[in-house]
Amino acid sequence: MLHSSSDASPADRQRWAERRRSLETGRYRVSPDGRRGWRRKRAFDLLVNLFGKLLQPTPFHALGRRNALDLRLVELELAFPHLPAAFDGYRILHLSDTHLDHFPELASVARGLLAGVEVDMLALTGDVHGNHRAPIARSIGLLAEALDGVRVRGPRLAVLGNHDPAAMAEALEGLGFEVLLNRSLVLEHAGQRLHLTGLDDVNCFYTEAALAALAVQPDHDAFRIALVHSAEMADHADAAGCALYLCGHTHGGQICLPGGRPLVTQLTRCRLAGRGLWRWGSMTGYTSCGLGVSGPPLRFNCRGEAAVITLRRRP
C-alpha cells in the first residue's frame, strides 16, 4: 500500500509552531466559535480535582480507580456505499486521550489489551500528554510501552490535542507517527484511494488553518476521513464531504450517571457528538471514551477504551 502526504515545508512547520506556542502562552483559548479566557476552565479543573480529593477517604475512590484500569477493546464494523472496494475490510486502531503520564499504571494494562492486535492503520486523535508540567518524554515512553504488542501494517497517524504542547509533534514523529497538522494524506491501494485530513486541536488552539485544511477538496473521487481531537469541527467536515470523523477529547464523560450519561463533555459546539457512534448529516463519526483519564484518576459508568474499526463497502 502506498501513501503520499501534502507535506508542509520547514517554513510552514516553523510558522505553525510559533503560532501554536503563542496560543499556548496567551490569555485566551480559541475555538471555532471565538476566544474565551482560561479562568473558567481553570476553575472547572480545580473543582474536578477537589471532587477527587473529597472521594479519597471513601470506598468510591478505590472503586473509581479500579474502573479506570478496566479498559475494553471496542470492535466496530462501519459500512459505506462509496468506500473503494480495495479498502473493504481495512482495519483502523483508534486511540485517543491516553494521558499515560497522569496514570502510569494504565500503560501495562493497555499493553495487555492491545497485545496481538493487527490493523492496517493506527489513528491517534490527541492528548497523549496529561500533566502540563511533566516532561513529554514520559508520556512518549509510556505510549511506546502501551503499543509494544500492536502490529500496524500501514501508517501510524496522529493529531494533537489540547493537552499536547507543540513539541509533542516532534516527539510523536520520533515514535514513528506521521503528525497531521492541518494537512492531508492520501493512501493508495490497487489504484484506489483514501484521503485523510488531520487537524491541530480546535478546542483551545483553533486557527483558520484548520478550516482551510478541510476546505481543500481532493483532486480525485476519494473516500475522506477526518482525524480531529474533538468533535467540534463535525459540521464543517460533513460540509467538506468527509465520510468518517474520528475524535476523542470528552473521555465519554469519564464520570457519568448510571446508563453512561455524561455530566460534562467539555465541548463548545457539536455537543450531540460527545460519545460513541453518531451521525452528522451524511457523515458517520466516532468519539472515543479515551484510554486514559484527566483530573482524578477515576471513572464511573464509562470504561476507558481502544477501538478497532473495520471499514466495509456496503452494496
Roles of regions detected by a PLM:
Residues 93-96, 121-127, 155-162, 180-183, ...:
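Active-site neighborhood of phospho(di)ester-bond hydrolases with catalytic His/Asp-centered motifs
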Residues 1-50, 237-239, 294-315:
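A short C-terminal boundary segment appended to hydrolase-like catalytic domains
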Residues 71, 80-93, 185-197, 223, ...:
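Beta-strand-turn-beta hairpins that frame and shape the catalytic cleft
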Residues 98-103, 133-136, 200-204, 223, ...:
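Short, flexible loop segments at the rims of nucleotide/cofactor-binding pockets, characterized by
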Residues 104-189:
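Core catalytic region of metal-dependent phosphoesterases/phosphodiesterases
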Residues 174, 231-310, 315:
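Conserved beta-sheet core of the metallophosphoesterase superfamily
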Residues 174-175, 183, 189-228, 234-235, ...:
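Binuclear metal-dependent hydrolase catalytic cores centered on His/Asp/Glu-rich metal-binding motifs
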Residues 2-19, 41, 45-141:
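N-terminal active-site segment of His-dependent metallophosphoesterases
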